[in-house]
């Protein structure tokens, strides 16, 4: 059984071992030890689901770090939670956050934070001062913190594209850069605060013939989209997309950022050509 999971801003396509509507078992929650393929895919799925037209408030993109690494992930967790509480007192409506690693083995925090009209006029400066006060034991410099406005939907998508494009093998998420004393327990690597306007995903099931044809069209779409961007890196990446040995190709799925209307157009085209969906 092949399954397409369609989000507002993209999709995943793969092989599904469960019948449509079947309840899927979940494993026991274990200690988090850095980024995994599962946490990366869940973060991407959430970002793809957001209805950006309904985002309200004054938005800021934050990049916050420290010079000295906290001794344990529990110490870092206390800092992050205390920082969240301070932002709530400043009028925080919602926030998405991601933890990544610097090459020197120190964590830094990326956030997209939305505030209501009660937020102070000099909000960026207040946020940087609050952060530096909280992490004074770890020697944070105000010059190393960045707080920038997200002024429109384009700014939001710039934030999303940066933090959703990085996979588990990116150096800022690599286990090689996890502090030695954090190796067995890092705590959660991403999360969200407050109410987010999301569009629920749709699941569409299909047979092998439809799956393979959809995958071919996606490959061509990705190459055309890369050429339109003019990015040499994206063009090279698109040329190698889905190039695997035949045995792996039989089950290889796909995951793409794609406007919802373009995906629907592809599905309608397949339907008109006689391809079936279950």
From Swiss-Prot:
Cysteine-cysteine disulfides: none
Substrates-to-products reaction catalysed: ATP + (deoxyribonucleotide)n-3'-hydroxyl + 5'-phospho-(deoxyribonucleotide)m = (deoxyribonucleotide)n+m + AMP + diphosphate
Consequence recorded when altering residue 77 to H: In strain: New York
Keyword DNA-binding on entry: yes
Top-level taxon of the source organism: Viruses
Enzyme Commission no: 3.1.21.-, 6.5.1.1
Any one GO molecular function term: DNA binding
One Gene Ontology term from the biological process aspect of the record: DNA replication
Task performed by this protein: Isoform G2P plays an essential role in viral DNA replication. Binds the origin of replication and cleaves the dsDNA replicative form I (RFI) and becomes covalently bound to it via phosphotyrosine bond, generating the dsDNA replicative form II (RFII). In turn, viral DNA replication initiates at the 3'-OH of the cleavage site. After one round of rolling circle synthesis, protein G2P is linked to the newly synthesized ssDNA and joins the ends of the displaced strand to generate a circular single-stranded molecule ready to be packed into a virion.
Family: Belongs to the inovirus G2P protein family.
Name of the protein in question: Replication-associated protein G2P
Organism: Pseudomonas phage Pf3 (Bacteriophage Pf3)
């Amino acid at each position: 059984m092949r399954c397409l999971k369609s989000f507002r801003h993209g999709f995943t396509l793969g092989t599904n071992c469960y019948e449509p509507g079947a309840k899927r078992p979940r494993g026991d929650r274990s200690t988090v030890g850095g980024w995994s393929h599962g946490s990366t895919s869940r973060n991407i799925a959430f970002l793809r689901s957001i209805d950006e037209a309904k985002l309200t408030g004054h938005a800021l993109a934050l990049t916050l770090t420290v010079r000295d690494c906290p001794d344990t992930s529990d110490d870092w967790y206390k800092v992050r939670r205390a920082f969240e509480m301070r932002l709530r007192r400043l009028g925080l409506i919602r926030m998405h956050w991601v933890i990544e690693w610097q090459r020197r083995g120190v964590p830094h925090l990326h956030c997209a934070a939305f505030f209501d009209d009660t937020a102070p006029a000099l909000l960026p400066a207040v946020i940087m001062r609050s952060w530096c006060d909280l992490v004074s034991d770890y020697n944070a410099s105000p010059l190393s913190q960045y707080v920038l406005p997200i002024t429109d939907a384009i700014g939001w998508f710039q934030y999303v594209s940066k933090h959703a494009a990085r996979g588990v093998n990116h150096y800022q998420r690599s286990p090689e850069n996890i502090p030695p004393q954090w190796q067995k327990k890092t705590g959660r690597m991403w999360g969200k605060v407050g109410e987010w306007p999301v569009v629920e995903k749709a699941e569409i099931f299909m047979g092998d013939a439809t799956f393979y044809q959809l995958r071919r069209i996606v490959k061509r779409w990705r190459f055309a989209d890369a050429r339109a961007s003019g990015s040499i890196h994206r063009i090279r990446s698109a040329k190698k997309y889905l190039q695997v040995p035949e045995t792996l190709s039989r089950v290889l799925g796909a995951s793409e950022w794609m406007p919802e209307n373009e995906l629907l157009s592809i599905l309608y085209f397949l339907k008109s050509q006689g391809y079936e969906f279950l």
